[in-house]
């Protein structure tokens, strides 16, 4: 995610001191605090990197220390406290501070008394001391798998964004091809994932198809998704572009971004917002005939030049929701006109052109006054009739 390269150095090479060193302790190196395993024991600590290459300003600069008496430090697992601790302390060694001017050595800081701003929580930064619940997240006790959105922004400010990170077509979540366990979901076991994505290119996907809970997936950068039973537990870093999203078997809400998205709701009654761009939308068919909703908030979201394709519409079951155009495009009503007839120049005219041979429908609409051509279009695989359209 940043222009930092880690190369392991032999611990016996005293002539070429590593920039960052890791070690266990039973007493702090400066002798100030004894280690232990009780409630007041120091769990881990680290020193900031040296201000000069020689590191002569601090003999401990760039060193990271873990309490040997904490058994979980010897075998950390993604999502547990020790894994979070390792990432937190490494953040210090790279130059990251706590979001506020607090520290365990200064007492027992609290969100109410010491948070410098609202987002100072583990939802936004693994460098925070404060539970993600303070900012509305619920990770079911799962700690961040790695750096979170604010950590990514901070480390990129210090070292620059790495534009070679996963430039191919990358899948995050289920069916992941990242080769990273902290960006992968493997089971619907009641423990949701908790990670932030940085991606530098390609055509990429958030895949949460293995979950059965109700989910909300948001592809906008800087936004959080609620997946696998968690709340706001997956984020996309600022500046990262993820094009596609796949939901699970529950009732999912999927929100696209300004790219050409592929959104798939899968089973369950799903709500899909394609947003801008020429999107391909699958509600997902299943034996229970659940209703899928394809929602449009503005006529710019599916134009004649760059129109959406709804790939699996079921007449009498699914709905196309155009009510957002009432407010954002000042349309007071829809006026259906016959297939193939000319637009009269009155905005709000809508036409459904069904191709029986191919089994497709083109939904065309004029949203401009004194215009005699459609400016809004959706191509639908399936038959669409007036009763399938919502405009409340």
Please place each PLM-identified region on the residue numbering.
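Extracytoplasmic and endomembrane cell-envelope/extracellular-matrix remodeling and assembly machinery
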Residues: 139-192, 201, 205, 210-216, ...
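Low-complexity, polar/charged sequence tracts that form flexible coils or short amphipathic helices
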Residues: 58, 62, 67, 77-78, ...
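Metzincin-family zinc-dependent endopeptidase catalytic domain
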Residues: 1-122, 129-138, 188-192, 201-205, ...
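Hydrophobic "rung" positions of tandem beta-strand repeat architectures
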Residues: 197, 206, 217, 245, ...
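Extracellular, beta-strand-rich repeat scaffolds characterized by small/acidic residue-biased motifs
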Residues: 17, 201, 210-212, 221, ...
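Acidic glycine/aspartate-rich repeat arrays in secreted/surface proteins
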Residues: 13-24, 100-124, 130, 138-145, ...
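Soluble non-cytosolic domains of exported or imported proteins
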Residues: 76-85, 142-149, 236
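Acidic/polar low-complexity surface segments
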Residues: 216-244, 284-300
